């Protein structure tokens, strides 16, 4: 499984693993173990090996390089033949590549840093239900970032008071409001009551402002059937956007919802709740750039991507690296931004990155400069925490955004 002379094919899925072998385990042995366990290998030779062509189907560790400044840590590059994976299934891809190998005894730690998804595989996926340009057309909003707000407190409001907060924020000038990730259907506010109150608030704000408004109605539920029922009710109520927690809900459920949203004209907002459990440790886990690629394949029109400047962790260059992986068609390899492979998405639509978490109007120049127009700035406490109330908070955000966009268009340096 360690084959340093192997020449990768255009159809191979390539993986870059950050590998920390146990003391005494050579990196070549550890890299071979990763390739074997994540493809055709098992702990012994079996008789049925002779009934297939292992040479055709096995993963190959084709390169190993030491990590600069780290003791006994390496980047292992592994190539997987395309035939190992079911078409259009992120679930199967992850089950194969990361399903068992992270518990391997020969490794002290293992991190999946990046994946190269070949066009031959990415073309089998639905991708975002609509994408950046179609969303702008649906909402009739161009030339600036979109502006949103997560309704707070995230838990405890009644449906009526929740709808009131939505109305005040939309009436004040926001493009959309949002359910928090853990707002599903709790005793204090059942989902149907919330959906009805939000729809009423949204239509009232639209009538008074003359702008198209949105709210991300969280359809995440305990079963796929219940999730689809909630998404259908969101469509019937006339709210243009639904929402899913894609890591806690699962990739199979997410892809099913993405198909429904595409077929029924709903935009799909994605929250990454639980991501830090998977991606926060540098040496062990799955980097968010991999989860971002997986989301683009599974389907979502926008996804939370960190802020660089807010309360949640995120390095600027690395964050902008996976923002480009979400939005752009073709992304060149750039190790300084953590991009290990050139990625060609061909014609797959892009995904809006959402900046959210501890941001307020003071951050608006930096957010506008860092993320550009094709992004969503999501202010929760930065709207609802305004001393004058919810509507003045929304007004402040809208005025700040329009001032920053005008200054940028006039050639001002927003970074200063």
Curated annotation (Swiss-Prot):
Enzyme Commission code(s) on record = 4.1.1.39
Q: Which GO terms describe its biological process?
A: photorespiration; reductive pentose-phosphate cycle
Q: Which SUPFAM superfamilies does the record cross-reference, listed alphabetically?
A: RuBisCo, C-terminal domain, RuBisCO, large subunit, small (N-terminal) domain
Q: Note how many cofactor molecules are bound and how.
A: Binds 1 Mg(2+) ion per subunit.
Per the record, residues carrying N6-carboxylysine are: 178
Compartments annotated for it: namely: Plastid, Chloroplast
> In chain numbering, where does the site feature Transition state stabilizer fall?
311
Q: Where does Mg(2+) bind?
A: 178, 180-181
Active-site residue numbers: 152 (proton acceptor), 271 (proton acceptor)
Keyword list, A-Z = Calvin cycle, Carbon dioxide fixation, Chloroplast, Disulfide bond, Lyase, Magnesium, Metal-binding, Monooxygenase, Oxidoreductase, Photorespiration, Photosynthesis, Plastid
Task: Share the record's PTM remark.
Answer: The disulfide bond which can form in the large chain dimeric partners within the hexadecamer appears to be associated with oxidative stress and protein turnover.
Q: Which reaction does it catalyse?
A: 2 (2R)-3-phosphoglycerate + 2 H(+) = D-ribulose 1,5-bisphosphate + CO2 + H2O; D-ribulose 1,5-bisphosphate + O2 = 2-phosphoglycolate + (2R)-3-phosphoglycerate + 2 H(+)
Amino acids binding substrate: 100, 150, 154, 272, 304, 356
Entry GO CC: chloroplast
Could you tell me one molecular function GO term of this UniProt entry? monooxygenase activity
Q: What is its main location?
A: plastid
Q: What are its cofactors?
A: Mg(2+)
Q: What else is known?
A: The basic functional RuBisCO is composed of a large chain homodimer in a 'head-to-tail' conformation. In form I RuBisCO this homodimer is arranged in a barrel-like tetramer with the small subunits forming a tetrameric 'cap' on each end of the 'barrel'.
The family line of this record is: Belongs to the RuBisCO large chain family. Type I subfamily.
Subunit organization: Heterohexadecamer of 8 large chains and 8 small chains; disulfide-linked. The disulfide link is formed within the large subunit homodimers.
Family matches, as NCBIfam families = PRK04208.1
Function statement: RuBisCO catalyzes two reactions: the carboxylation of D-ribulose 1,5-bisphosphate, the primary event in carbon dioxide fixation, as well as the oxidative fragmentation of the pentose substrate in the photorespiration process. Both reactions occur simultaneously and in competition at the same active site.
This protein's name = Ribulose bisphosphate carboxylase large chain
Source taxonomy: Eukaryota, Viridiplantae, Streptophyta, Embryophyta, Tracheophyta
Recorded name of the encoding gene:
rbcL
